[in-house]
Amino acid sequence: MKKQHDTIIVLDFGSQYNQLIARRIREFGVYSELHPHTITAEEIKAMNPKGIIFSGGPNSVYGEGALHCDEKIFELGLPIFGICYGMQLMTQHFGGKVERANHREYGKAVLKVENESKLYANLPEEQVVWMSHGDLVTGLPEGFVVDATSESCPIAGMSNEGENLYGVQFHPEVRHSEHGNDLIKNFVFGVCGCSEGWNMENFIEVELEKIRETVGDKKVLCALSGGVDSSVVAVLIHKAIGDQLTCIFVDHGLLRKDEAEGVMKTFSEGFHMNVIKVDAQERFMNKLKGVEDPEQKRKIIGNEFIYVFDDEASKLQGMDFLAQGTLYTDIVESGTATAQTIKSHHNVGGLPEDMQFKLIEPLNTLFKDEVRVLGSELGIPDEIVWRQPFPGPGLGIRVLGEITEEKLEIVRESDAILREEIIKAGLDREVWQYFTALPGMRSVGVMGDERTYDYTVGIRAVTSIDGMTADWARIPWDVLEKISVRIVNEVKHVNRIVYDITSKPPATIEWE
């Protein structure tokens, strides 16, 4: 990335939220990069950042395997902001006291600002924040003062303003912290003195150059699904290298209703790209027969997907690279070197060791909302840019347990009804992601005066900015009623509809 803008470095101590910190900073027009906690002070100095943020993490600073950083980082003279574990690490380094809390604090808490340091400038004295910690600071290091408290956390915020050192026990990067964005903004601009200067135009310029340098005169295969991510990847790479790109669209039989036809029409006819369609439904279904475990399903689908590409590439000449639409959120949900794994992702797990391609993942530093902005900048039509997020394993992870043709058809038809009614109600931009899932359970019902014993369909709809955290969508009851009535009446073997009202965390958006 060209250094024509200020940069904030985020050190990764294993928090599942660490990518969010960088995302929040980018929202302000300031570039931010995430780096492992093992990075050296010299390496940071060479990057010339304006400030450093220590992320949270699942460890205890006194526990076995506790993560630490190069202590010379504290001697660089840069502003440092420690979040949760990062605050505890800072406390330990400067001689303060960290202890195990009586009860792990998880969820919303009311924060009371006791000292208006630069971090809390122009913020209310009381605010709701998101806590997620098992340890807490019980003794301040020398030179530090208490900035904020909560009912369960006497030192919820601290600072040494003379040294530009700040710490908070809560997570300002999570949307549940109502003034978290403003607090991070105060650090970035008020403490570090950053100026806005990073935007999507910069990203496009740098990525096009990077793709051309990486690929040279070689050829690239793109895993095109018609979803937002792969569409943006295809258009970006096509813009960089033109006809050196060949798109392969694999119809694995796990797509939404009418999706395969739509993909071919849009990209082959509309964008004039070289798109090869592979009909592989039977191949995938044979591999998935009898498989119930979700991780195994993801791995099988991921492996088979790449093997199909291998087969197709062998028919083509000189294909060296495989392009994928891996996002920042994909990587964090699959676990980084320090993050605890939640679930494997199809773009970052399940790749065979003997894969014959080198990977190109031009979106792997972007979040979903940034990808949409990028798509618009590249001139991709709104109907594609604003398409629903759809996982690579497709409906394979929306049918819980073993996948059968009957179950796929139920999900495919019910999902089409849900999408149609959400669009009719004008909620398609308001609701970030919505889909149906089949939990595999049957229940007793009565239809036409006869007893039935049929499937239950689950509806999942969430509001979110970037997929890292999400709230369940408050869809109007009359809209939910229409959806429910239509699915039960129009989709065979369904007699009950349930609505998922769980936020993320603790649940993930997808059910598998």
From Swiss-Prot:
One of the record's GO cellular component terms = cytosol
List residues of the GMPS ATP-PPase domain: 198-387
Ranges for domain Glutamine amidotransferase type-1:
7-197
- The annotated active site, in chain numbering, is C84 (nucleophile), H171, E173
GO terms of molecular function: ATP binding; GMP synthase activity
- Catalytic activity entry: XMP + L-glutamine + ATP + H2O = GMP + L-glutamate + AMP + diphosphate + 2 H(+)
At the top of the EC hierarchy, this enzyme's class is ligase
Keywords, A to Z?
ATP-binding, Glutamine amidotransferase, GMP biosynthesis, Ligase, Nucleotide-binding, Purine biosynthesis
Give the E.C. number(s).
6.3.5.2
**Keyword flag Cell division:** no
Where would you find the membrane-spanning parts of this chain? none
Could you tell me which pathway this protein works in? Answer: Purine metabolism; GMP biosynthesis; GMP from XMP (L-Gln route): step 1/1
Assembly: Homodimer.
The function of this protein is: Catalyzes the synthesis of GMP from XMP.
Stated name of the protein:
GMP synthase [glutamine-hydrolyzing]
Q: Which organism is it from?
A: Bacillus mycoides (strain KBAB4) (Bacillus weihenstephanensis)
What gene codes for this chain? guaA
